[in-house]
Amino acid sequence: MNESFAQLFEESLKEIKTRPGSIIRGTIVSIEKDMVLVDAGLKSESAIPVEQFQNSQGLLDIQVGDQIDVALDAIEDGFGETLLSREKAKRHEAWLILEKAHEKSETVIGIINGKVKGGFTVELNDIRAFLPGSLVDVRPVRDTIHLEGKELEFKVIKLDQKRNNVVVSRRAVIESENSAERDQLLENLQEGMHVKGIVKNLTDYGAFVDLGGVDGLLHITDMAWKRVKHPSEIVNVGDEINIKILKFDRERTRVSLGLKQLGEDPWIAISKRYPEETKLSGRVTNLTDYGCFVEIEEGVEGLVHVSEMDWTNKNIHPSKVVTVNDVVEVMVLDIDEERRRISLGLKQCKINPWKEFSETHKKGVHVLGKIKSITDFGIFIGLNGGIDGLVHLSDISWTIPGEEAVVKYKKNDEISAVVLQVDAERERISLGIKQLEEDPFNTYIANHKKGAIITGIIKSLDKKNIIVKLPENLEGVIKLTEITRVYSETMINKLKIEDKILVKLSSFDRKNRIIYLTIHMIDEDEKKDLTAPSNNKTNDDSFSNVMTEAFKAAKNTE
């Protein structure tokens, strides 16, 4: 009875071991080009594809006679052969290792080999695990290029074989390794200390440095005295650097580091080293839309504003003048030590065309140039040196209003003008066209003395004045109040527009360029006809009406 029970038990064990999916022991019988023959003590030897025995480098790490674990795929495949799998057995072994590591909180070796949503994938002996982004390190890590492809230690924090789900943490390993070292470092750490560290990670705002169990932040503004666009300009991941502890918050375990603080501040007493108007050479480090930055010494940069790049083009883009790494000559315009700002000038190291023009073109000098533009207030003329001069509307003609006189000019016309004024500081040149000729007003009053009797033509009138056209395109003014005191309303009404009239020069207003006239006094017999001989037969009722009103107004005043 006992023998029968023992026999049945042994047979049942064999049956369990030979069920599909079970792991059994086998011996390598032979190794062929494409297949490996394995004897697992079953009905027949099984051929397993050689690829299942290759390592990650594609090499075989077995030899004939080795005993290995294999998974039983099928006892009978329909052709009388048993199917075995080395690959499934290795995967089973890998899961056992992970389960053991998870239970005992041991580390496993894996390789980060890809990025997925929320984290990364890790290869653990043919098992694909998930590494959350927050568990890569004790500090946030955006870029894992320096970690990918390397064998790293991880801790298994979640395991579910049925769902094929494995979650690992690298952060847990680091925290465990650093705990003792970290405690000692935190105890000894003091502000102002000089320490060594290894750059672990770079961000847009700085670099995280491992001080030996404790990470510190080296902010981008504390990397160098000069302006730094990105931390990679100063340090790289893996660099061992000397740094200074700037601030240490023990409660929050936060450490602020400084690299530039290891050296002297180059901004101290910089105004003494570089007084205003000092000329020096520097290297262009960066271009912007508003100017370029020039390094004048290690850690010190100044800004050449776009307005200080070229004398004649105020809106030129910096890239049209300089390029990065150009060595240029600049002038110190202003230094603000408190705000650590230096204003530099590029154009100040070149000839100032405005100053040069002022030295070679005094008032009254004639110039020749093409019209560059015509505006509501005047004409701009291009001059030598790439600068412009302005002819104001009031300086186009002596006798014709500027708005009318400017009409005969057009862009690109070559014209002459006279220099009226040069303001090199404000970069302004005033020119005149009418000054090319004598002022007809001055000429006229020079040739005609007060009291001279001349002939004019009535041009227009209002309730106060009669405007009289004179020779040389000049005009004179007769005040109606002067007329009504001498002549009757009937006589006044004889006057008509375009009538020739004898007038006497009364006075000159040089400032306002006005010639005042009076009607020439004549004998009583001659008052019948105030006007000079004329063929004008035109009656002007409006003129007569105005004269009548003016006459009445004058009488009422009396």
Curated annotation (Swiss-Prot):
Keywords recorded for this protein, A-Z: Repeat, Ribonucleoprotein, Ribosomal protein, RNA-binding
Q: Where is the S1 motif domain?
A: 21-87, 105-171, 192-260, 277-347, 364-434, 451-520
Keyword flag 4Fe-4S: no
Record flagged with keyword Repeat: yes
Any one GO MF term held by the record is:
structural constituent of ribosome
A GO cellular component annotation in the UniProt record: cytosolic small ribosomal subunit
Q: Name one GO biological process term.
A: translation
Q: Name the family.
A: Belongs to the bacterial ribosomal protein bS1 family.
Instruction: Summarize the protein's role.
Output: Binds mRNA; thus facilitating recognition of the initiation point. It is needed to translate mRNA with a short Shine-Dalgarno (SD) purine-rich sequence.
- Its name, as the record gives it, is Small ribosomal subunit protein bS1
Q: Which organism is it from?
A: Buchnera aphidicola subsp. Acyrthosiphon pisum (strain APS)
Q: Which gene encodes it?
A: rpsA
